[in-house]
Amino acid sequence: MSSSVSPLAPKTVPDMPVIAGVRLATAEAGIRYKNRTDVLLAVMDKGTAVAGVFTKSKCPSAPVEWCRAKLKGGKARALVVNSGNANAFTGKTGRSSTALTAKIAAKAVGCSESEIFLASTGVIGEPLDATKFDGVLGRLAETAEPGDYLAAAKAIMTTDTFPKVATATVKLGKAKVTINGMAKGAGMIAPDMATMLSFVFTDAPIAPAALQALLKSGVEDTFNAVTIDGDTSTSDTLLAFATGAAAEHGAPKISRASDPRLKAFVKAFNQVLANLAEQVARDGEGARKLVEITVEGAKTKASARKIAMSIANSPLVKTAIAGEDANWGRVVMAVGKAGEPADRDKLSISFNGIRVARSGARDPDYDEAQVSEAMKAPEIAIKVSLGLGKGRDRVMTCDLTKEYVAINGDYRS
């Protein structure tokens, strides 16, 4: 957790409404540091549906493995999140810690261990002492209230400089339903199916299979379209919980993701995911500039995504942006190395709406002073036009600064 807030942080924080069927509490358990809030417990009412997407890393954390196994049941009563220790690459000890944490949480909440979901973030490779949860989770279960999402978001931060929350309210049938979300990120972010840690709660009555389909679809153009440093975490987890409490106020029970009554809900749900994903990009470690990369005219959307990610993950592109240099040559390099169809002589590039390259060469109207001034902006939009087809996609990233090196060089110390 940084002491200075990113200059890209949102100027305002939304008021997070209560969601019926969800109670939250946080505590200091001394997971890695003293005098730091590092545990979150979310308690959900019986019958709450759960869905999740996770890292595709071949070295997943013990909590990720636990959640994947329990997701099959489709129901959740509690979520336990700790910061400071990822419980990843910890072998049998890590799996035992996960099992013990779930056992303690189940006893505290009064449910089956199969209804407990877990997430950990922090240092990889160090054993997690799950006995630190003993007593703590019991107290949290007793004191949990349907309230402070901002405090909950703070509890899961590591190198984040600000808590990330988002909310939306929408009609489902004749009833109002609420969607609240929180996330943490900052570094080791190049998601594949999920990203970092993020948790979304709603009172909509949506069945587990339908919620899973909505989540899997929703992450594709939100969390999966964000990268900070090209490194996919061992712990990436996105969980969604639907308490169904809005059914008491007339919200229809939804069993299929294709139900037309979900149209407005899906839009709001995806907006919450997009909001959280952008906040993650805004809080990239050491970031001073938010970068949006759009690739159009590709053969396919998938091809456009791959090229956009190649640009977004290029250290040379990212450091040029940090230096406020519209170095389109580095963008050309990143396009060429992506391994996707591209024609040098059809390529056009612009920075913040100013075209710098056209048809494979520098734009004849290029004005160095104009472009240099545009690069001073805190938000940079790079557009690449390939001229090959109709494929288009957009990804978010940030610049790469000296602060990123300092943060990660000192991470374990």
From Swiss-Prot:
GO molecular function, one term: L-glutamate N-acetyltransferase activity
Pfam families membership: ArgJ
Enzyme kind, highest EC tier: transferase
BP-aspect Gene Ontology terms: L-arginine biosynthetic process; ornithine biosynthetic process
UniProt keyword list: Acyltransferase, Amino-acid biosynthesis, Arginine biosynthesis, Autocatalytic cleavage, Cytoplasm, Multifunctional enzyme, Transferase
Domain of life of the organism encoding this protein: Bacteria
InterPro entries: Arg_biosynth_ArgJ, ArgJ-like_dom_sf, ArgJ_beta_C
Entry binding sites for substrate: 158, 184, 195, 285, 408, 413
Signal sequence interval, chain numbering: none
GO cellular component annotations of the record: cytoplasm
Active site feature: 195
General function of this protein: Catalyzes two activities which are involved in the cyclic version of arginine biosynthesis: the synthesis of N-acetylglutamate from glutamate and acetyl-CoA as the acetyl donor, and of ornithine by transacetylation between N(2)-acetylornithine and glutamate.
PANTHER family, per the entry: ARGININE BIOSYNTHESIS BIFUNCTIONAL PROTEIN ARGJ, ARGININE BIOSYNTHESIS BIFUNCTIONAL PROTEIN ARGJ, MITOCHONDRIAL
Complex and partners: Heterotetramer of two alpha and two beta chains.
Entries under NCBIfam families matching the protein: ArgJ (TIGR00120), PRK05388.1 (NF003802)
Protein known as: Arginine biosynthesis bifunctional protein ArgJ
Source organism per UniProt: Bradyrhizobium diazoefficiens (strain JCM 10833 / BCRC 13528 / IAM 13628 / NBRC 14792 / USDA 110)
Organismal lineage: Bacteria, Pseudomonadati, Pseudomonadota, Alphaproteobacteria, Hyphomicrobiales
Gene (name only): argJ
